[in-house]
Amino acid sequence: MARYRHSRSRSRSXYRRRXRRRSRYRSRRRRYRGRRRRRSRRGRRRGYSRRRYSRRRRRRY
């Protein structure tokens, strides 16, 4: 009974956590990777440069 209970709870928790962890990690990884890569490469360089240049040009010119 003890072994069966332990293995059953382990498999259930595990399964639930994997699942959950896999789905959450996949969604979070895809979102974080997309946001980080887009923001760090395109967002920071193009976004920040465009915003800063547009603000400077609008203010100066």
Curated annotation (Swiss-Prot):
One of its GO terms (biological process) is chromosome condensation. InterPro entries: Protamine_P1. Signal peptide: none annotated. Keywords: Chromosome, Developmental protein, Differentiation, DNA condensation, DNA-binding, Nucleosome core, Nucleus, Spermatogenesis. Coiled coil: none annotated. It is found in: Nucleus; Chromosome. The keyword DNA-binding applies. Residues 1-61 are annotated as: Disordered. GO terms for molecular function: DNA binding. Belongs to the protamine P1 family. Protamines substitute for histones in the chromatin of sperm during the haploid phase of spermatogenesis. They compact sperm DNA into a highly condensed, stable and inactive complex. This is Sperm protamine P1. It comes from Onychogalea fraenata (Bridled nail-tailed wallaby).
